[in-house]
Amino acid sequence: MSKTHLTEKKFSDFALHPKVIEALDNKGFSNCTPIQALTLPFTVEGRDVAGQAQTGTGKTLAFLASAFHYLLTHPAAEERQTNQPRALIMAPTRELAVQIYSDAEDLAQATGLKMGLAYGGDGYDKQLKILESGVDILIGTTGRLIDYTKQGHINLNAVQVVVLDEADRMYDLGFIKDIRWLFRRMPPVNERMNLLFSATLSYRVRELAFEQMNHAEYIEVEPLQKTGHRIREELFYPSNEEKMRLLQTLLEEEWPDRCIIFANTKHRCEDIWAHLAADGHRVGLLTGDVAQKKRLRILEEFSNGNIDILVATDVAARGLHIPLVTHVFNYDLPDDCEDYVHRIGRTGRAGESGHSISLACEEYALNLPAIEDYIQHSIPVSKYNSQALLKDLPAPKRRYRSRSGNHQRRNNLSHRNNTPRNNRKRSG
């Protein structure tokens, strides 16, 4: 984590429980990020917080440290039952729930508090077995949480802390009715600590905070600009016919250590994956059609560096903390202006620099004016030489073949044209 991302405030400056401080110190966390420095003064006193902060700002650690501190300093009621979690953390996606759980493991080990996961699509009985043994902190998605609650496997009457992460995304995905259903099964708002975090504190998010929080403190951490001042943005205008070759040429020139390529549909993502896999890239595919176990494995391989390129729909654009992403490619300009910000926010995180490259093709170029109006600046345009694009590229890989990214990067470029690398660079 870059030092420029941190404040002068230290975790030890706050009255956090010693076990929380010890766990943070063991992981090398001493100084707070801005969102952490603003959140902790309120949460150590048990006060509610509604925070606005983009992903990559340290908000996960802010609410985890707050939740663990609260549970350690507020003992559970003597009549609490085994199936009653003390803290509930709700996330919009399975991947984000798993990420939060992973981030919390060191705190759980240091404090002795037990955790459980509840998300759909996989592991119903495995998750249930852990819950039946009793957990202090339950992290999950709303659908599976409601399922377990209706079946009587969990009871929310003893919840002392509730966290709603990515609240705006919850609205986008239509989960707000589920959230309200779960809130109605918990103790009254003044008998629990309530934390809400969102990339935007829109009217509808504030309305939810008013309903379900006890005089929440509103805190905001805004980047210097919506797209982040450490992200270098770049825009190309390819024809539909040259779009794929331009992408592959840019990948050849940039040779990113770790990049995400976003497209607007799963079919387009599959097509991109097929071309890159055939060209020898270590590439993974992340769409809604990919089985849950495989999705988690692909994310793990990407985070560990076994995959260099992740091709994804917007299912992966929000909430996931994937470190050291150097490049983001918008193969398609998104239809939603906010998605542009969330996509390129995968890079340039935690004080690091990043590079965003967007392709404004004939199909999606009409989305550009609204995006530039939303981010309040024009995206710098670069030109390219059509004659310098890579030629003789292999045919896309058949879709039934593995998409897991096990193919090694190419060791030779004998199938390329013979143009020297420096002469193939874009102009402009």
Curated annotation (Swiss-Prot):
Domain of life: Bacteria
Domain Helicase ATP-binding residues, every copy: 40-219
CDD domains found in the cross-reference section: DEADc (cd00268), SF2_C_DEAD (cd18787)
Keyword Cytoplasm recorded: yes
Name this protein carries in UniProt: ATP-dependent RNA helicase RhlB
Gene: rhlB
Gene Ontology biological-process entries: RNA catabolic process
Region (Disordered) residue spans: 392-428
The enzyme's E.C. designation: 3.6.4.13
Record organism: Photorhabdus laumondii subsp. laumondii (strain DSM 15139 / CIP 105565 / TT01)
